[in-house]
Amino acid sequence: MKKFLPDLIAILAFIILSFAYFFPADIEGRILFQHDTAAGVGAGQESKEYLERTGERTRWTNSIFGGMPTYQMSPSYDSTTSLKGVEKVYRLFLPDYVVLTFIMMLGFYILLRAFGISAWLAGLGGVIWAFSSYFFILIPAGHIWKFVTLAYIPPTIAGVVLAYRKKYLLGGIVTALFIALQIQSNHIQMSYYFMFVILFFVGAYFEDAYRKKELPHFFKASGVLALAAVVGVCINISNLYHTYEYSKETMRGKSELKQEGAAASQTSSGLDRDYITNWSYGIGETLTLLVPNVKGGGSGSTMSQSEAAMAKANPMYNGIYSQLPQYFGEQPWTAGPVYVGAFVMFLFVLGCFIVKGPLKWALLGATIFSILLSWGKNFMGLTDFFIDYVPMYNKFRAVSSILVIAEFTIPLLAIFALKEILSKPDMLKQEKNCRGVIAALVLTAGVALILAVAPGTFFSSFITTQEMTALKQALPAEHLAPFVANLTEMREAIIASDAWRSFFIIVIGCLFLFLYQLRKLKASFTLAGVALLCLIDMWSVNKRYLNDEQFVPKSKRSEAFVKTQADEIILQDTTPNYRVLNFIGFPGNTFNENNTAYWHKSVGGYHAAKLRRYQEMIDHHIVPEMKETYQAVATAGGQMDSVDASKFRVLNMLNTKYFIFPAGEQGQAVPVMNPYAYGNAWFVDKVQYVNNANEEIDALNDILPTETAVVDVKFKEQLKGVTEGYKDSLSTIQLTSYEPNRLVYKASTPKDGVVVFSEIYYPGWQVTIDGQPVDIARADYILRAINMPAGEHTIEMWFDPQSIHVTESIAYAALALLLIGVMLLAWTQRSKIAKKS
């Protein structure tokens, strides 16, 4: 027990720190109102109600964007239930928010202990990793999947380290377990980025094994890790496989539309190049690693909120300063900077000089790699190469987030440097190491000092192009120059204030090291001093972006989905399946909110991975039709019988039965029933085959969907090549039963015909007519269509992909392998203890 006492103390310290940061909100039960979390609740409400009602999970919901799989909404599979039990134990059953910071610290602590670093130094490492500013920006934004995935990455790498340190079985189990946990956390982008880090690590261990002539050991460890990776991946194979299949149909997949001109230079598969690089870190903005407000801070903070800036403000312009953001970097918008700690940066740079071995070069290389790729459109040569040639890279947006690699490698090398210093009291007195100290001081404290006294040295302008354009339009010509000069002075003051702060933090940290080298401080006091300094530094910066004022009573979460009078009126319609289109805040809000989806089946919605074809319909038809509809309904005073239905044929074919319009200035809403919606399904007179996606989407401008179905020739076989349908007053089809993943219709027709359903086409849907399977075709770019034989029939349509059952079997087998590994480890440890006794 005594052996593990330092570890228990470290874990207890992590718990205390986590509770302390969120005090008093954690004690009072207050919560953060997070946009992405709230959006997830809205999008998942239909699935949640179905689970509560039936005890089964639905893999499809009609709540947003007309309908889509739930693979990236609620990626829960029965095979991961036991894994979630393990996760709860690992998290020590701690409450929300508190547990996030705790697991972030614990994971890095496990990694450092795997390296053989003392519990006290590993505890410091856990703190400086976990308190990097980016993580505290993720929490209020609601990017919890990303946060948790990042928290499980250090212990995953700990397994890699253990395996290469000849603890094969333990390393393999740890690697497999945490790969499984991080993939379950469902942010593949972060896992993907850290595959590069692992490659850097493997390269370092290969070099070390080669020099020591231990290549057999290297290959043995690599084999164990490869098996562990397979097990970890297979435990999550259901999630991974269906995410992969789904991604091909989303905005991350290949568009079938042929682009012309500049658009043709975008990626042929994956996200568009501009979309991938829209959030690119500025080259000068990289200095936020050292000085947090080097680009002003976050977009959500105005100039008037900065004391340093307002001390320089011309009172004449105070009204403008209350509207201008402090941030003036290259990104369109940011919640805050990536800051890893001033003294941590000093230790990292010092580590580049005093730490020996290939792992140092791996960490330095990974850091540079991360920074260069984070520049995105500001360094397009490298970015283009990765988009075009590196598998999967073009599937992810916001390249600035690859800086998480630097946030990992910088504190890791910093701890290695501090370990060297504390274990060798005289090392900094050596001439070559003195040069390293001087270089580290120049590159950190020196840069901070220059930023403090002359910010213009690094930046040519403190005003963005967009701001300058707006100011030229808003200000009289005679005020433009003095305003720009004053704004520049204010932003220089913001930078200088934080730069002085970083400078003195580095000086104080160096003073601790200097006193230790002079034998004036013991190693324990030096470590405690550095830990306190780093904690105060990073804690205070994080409080700028996540503080107690942001927490609200739990009741606020439910208030986000309070049923409005418009909702009440619409919900009186007991028809089982129709759609609602919310015009409030159009165009920006319609496709950026899920409040509508909480109560209704929405044409709009918010999700990072919507179906690509639906997005293309939004761009080509839905948004233009919304503009026409808004104007037409407003002109008609809400009297729909005076509105030309040909202006919104696509909305009608989506069975958009209700529009929600703004009424008055107090946020009120009024529902308007659309009598022209086509209903759940209809017979058509004609099938028009087209040769490609461009012809298909363009044809919708010319046809009347109730009469003609536009079908790609690729689906001609599914409709048996028919070109003429049959439709008269005797041909009817009616939805009789609705579940999100199962629809039942009754149809009657005197002749064979073709039916189009106002449901979104997606591979995996199955249809039977009177129990006999039939093929589904895609019609009108996004809808489903089938051949209907003459007579009276029951049509059943359901979504239960066979692939789920196959992948679940694989996942259970992988779980069994992991359990066998754990049992084998326990047996070997017991045998070792028995031998010692």
Regions found by a protein language model. Name each.
Residues 2-746, 752-756, 760:
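Conserved luminal/periplasmic juxtamembrane motif of membrane-embedded glycan-processing enzymes
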